[in-house]
Amino acid sequence: ALGEVTGESARRMVAAAQRHLVVPGAVRSLAPLPVVPPLAVRTDDGDFLNNPNEPYWGRYEGDEDTRRKPAYHNGTAWVWSLPMFCEALVRAWDFSPESVTAARSYLLSMEPLLNEGCLGHLPEVLDGDAPHAQRGCDAQAWSVSEAYRVWKILNCNE
């Protein structure tokens, strides 16, 4: 929905992301839904680290190789992605006043993150599962830069 896909197709994609991926302050890397075809995550020895039919991993914690790495792209919520979702939302609805208001509200869901962890900064990732604990780097530059970039887009006409 950032210009490559427009109209109703873009609106359907944004709505699906809204339903399954968006959490307060971030966007999950994978929805907590069954997948087809199966998506197996294995150890170097070939052992399964997940359920291939339901690969969602909602918590980014534990051992680096057997817990955090598999979770990173299978359910962990990325803070830097939420501003792009907000931009896609307003572009899918041609910057209607309602879409700008909604996008600002989503972007403001990042505000509590500024008051936790490394104060005044945005983290790298959150758990995909509630209560969406902050994880990874406490002060992630591209989380902040994306939030600022999109905030400017949403407020350029004021």
Functional labels for PLM-detected ranges:
Residues A1-E158:
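Acidic, mature catalytic/reactive cores of soluble proteins
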